[in-house]
Curated annotation (Swiss-Prot):
InterPro entries: Glyco_trans_1 (IPR001296), GS/SS (IPR011835), Starch_synth_cat_dom (IPR013534). Belongs to the glycosyltransferase 1 family. Bacterial/plant glycogen synthase subfamily. This is Glycogen synthase. It comes from the Bacteria. One of its GO terms (biological process) is glycogen biosynthetic process. GO terms for molecular function: alpha-1,4-glucan glucosyltransferase (ADP-glucose donor) activity; alpha-1,4-glucan glucosyltransferase (UDP-glucose donor) activity. Its EC number is 2.4.1.21. Keywords: Glycogen biosynthesis, Glycosyltransferase, Transferase. The keyword Nucleotide-binding does not apply.
Length: 485
């Protein structure tokens, strides 16, 4: 089976969020299942900078190609490289100086035109290279028009008509909603502008188009796949998603066990595994030392997040004065809304012996937090999958979460009688429930037997991409069978 995977960001070439981690890791594990994968992404300015920095070999494989159907004079070139850590996963880079020359990945002169240009260019690239794919796997709204093109404009194309499509929704909150005139720029038929097409409250919705026209849709956790069919989480697309419920699946993201391994991780202070778990305490002491916190055996909470409402910062704000009364330490890493940055700054200034506030992005410090902290906080309002809790489990750092989306699928409440469970959580999105979950974690931290059991349960979970890749193979087979009928 041959797959074309399409994404705006791919680790290590360009990374903004979790999407890059997914598309950077999944092909590696699909390759081990004997699936042939090619990746298509924009040749962002960031990719060019990283290529120069890390010395990646990137070759130009075509001269300029017309985007003939679009209302633009712009053309594109195709470059090629390899995904590190794979035998033959090719990465095809769509180059255009006008659309992909911004300093940031999700920036440019016109985000709608940019997404249309990229989506159309990927299809033209497949035609130019004459590759026969079984599946085109697209990710999020930026690439969601590809299934629309394939099922309308290119439905009779001999090379493209047999391709099945899979759309992965990583976060339904981002949909690509724009003015209707972009339909003309895209060269898509006018009849799509209706309630059963991509019309959306007087505008057009790229993600809605992908949901309607893809053969199979999936989200990044089973719970989130159910949640988005409800009004509370559906972002006004719950009806469209319910209409496709028989083709909607949830597959948990995995984590790259080679990249995130406390036994071999060169970013942490001291390597360890379950058999040498006492060395985790050395990581804690060295983290305290680096951050200027007193070297004390008290519960240390870690949090690595964008500081925004979605991540539960609004309910955290209401309890931090109470939390400050506990004999604990708290390490924050992240940036975001000014009101939350200011709140944490003030806490750090008021309680320097308890709070280490790091308002930045630092991949090395992140690993040290996963390894050195005792507990990891993720009180999210909603969380399609979440990777932070998986990294923390892998490093034996016990998650405290709100049971939503992927957090509900990966974290199970600890039961001291059965000794089952790997963390603590709460369901109602309010400050009192969060505070109680934190208090339960502190209580069991003081019971050495229970805490060691929690660490063991956490570190023996299978959160690898191997498991998830097998689920994606089944998904591809389902999509393929729909086209072959």
């Amino acid at each position: 089976m041959r797959i074309a995977m399409v994404s705006y960001e791919v680790y290590p070439f360009a990374k903004v969020g979790g999407l890059a981690d997914v598309v950077g890791a999944l092909p590696k594990y699909l390759e081990r299942q004997n699936i042939n994968v090619d990746i298509y992404m924009p040749y962002h300015k960031k990719v060019k900078q990283n290529a120069e920095k890390y010395g990646w070999a990137i070759e130009k494989i075509t001269e300029k190609v017309d985007a003939s159907m679009l209302r633009t004079e712009e053309k594109f070139e195709i470059y090629k490289t390899m995904l590190p850590g794979t035998k033959e996963v090719n990465v095809f880079l769509i180059n255009n100086e006008y659309y992909f020359n911004a300093d940031e990945v999700y920036a440019g002169p016109d985000l709608a035109e940019q997404a249309i240009f990229f989506s159309y260019s990927v299809i033209e690239a497949i035609r130019k290279l004459n590759f026969e794919y079984d599946i085109v796997h697209v990710n999020d709204w930026q690439t969601a028009l590809i299934p629309v093109y394939l099922k309308t404009v290119f439905r009779d194309d001999p090379l493209l008509s047999k391709i099945a499509t899979v759309l992965t929704i990583h976060n339904l909150g981002y949909q690509g909603i724009f003015e209707p005139e972009y339909l003309r720029f895209a060269g898509l038929p006018d009849y799509l502008y209706n309630i059963d097409g991509i019309e959306f409250y007087g505008k057009i919705n790229f993600l809605k188009g992908g949901i309607i026209f893809s053969d199979i849709i999936n989200t990044v956790s089973p719970t989130y796949a159910k949640e988005i069919q409800q009004k509370e989480y559906g972002e006004k697309l719950e009806g469209v998603l319910r209409a496709r419920s028989s083709d909607l699946y949830g597959i948990l993201n995995g984590i790259d066990y080679e990249e995130f391994n406390p036994l071999t991780d060169n970013k942490i202070y001291v390597n360890y595994d379950l058999n040498t778990i006492e060395k985790k305490k050395e990581n804690k002491k060295l983290l305290q030392k680096e951050l200027g916190l007193p070297e004390r055996d008290v519960p240390m909470f870690g949090m690595i997040n964008r500081l925004v409402d979605q991540k539960g910062l609004d309910i955290m704000a209401e309890i931090m004065d109470y939390v400050s009364l506990f004999d604990i330490q708290f390490v924050l890493l992240g940036t975001g809304e000014e009101k939350y940055e200011n709140m944490f700054k003030k806490l750090g200034e008021k309680y320097p012996e308890k709070y280490s506030i790091n308002l930045k992005f630092d991949i090395v410090l992140a690993q040290k937090i996963y390894a050195g902290c005792d507990m990891f906080l993720m009180p999210s309002r909603y969380e399609p999958c979440g990777l932070g809790q998986m990294y923390s489990l892998r490093y034996g750092t016990i998650p405290i979460v709100r049971y939503t989306g992927g957090l509900a699928d990966t974290v199970k409440e600890y039961n001291p009688e059965t000794k089952e469970g790997n963390g603590f959580g709460f369901e109602g999105f309010d400050p009192a429930h969060l505070l109680k979950a934190m208090a339960r974690a502190i209580y069991f931290y003081n019971s050495k037997e229970d805490w060691n059991t929690l660490i063991k349960n956490a570190m023996t979970m299978d959160l690898s991409w191997d498991k998830s890749a097998k689920e994606y193979v089944k998904l591809y087979q389902r999509a393929k069978s729909k086209v072959q009928r």
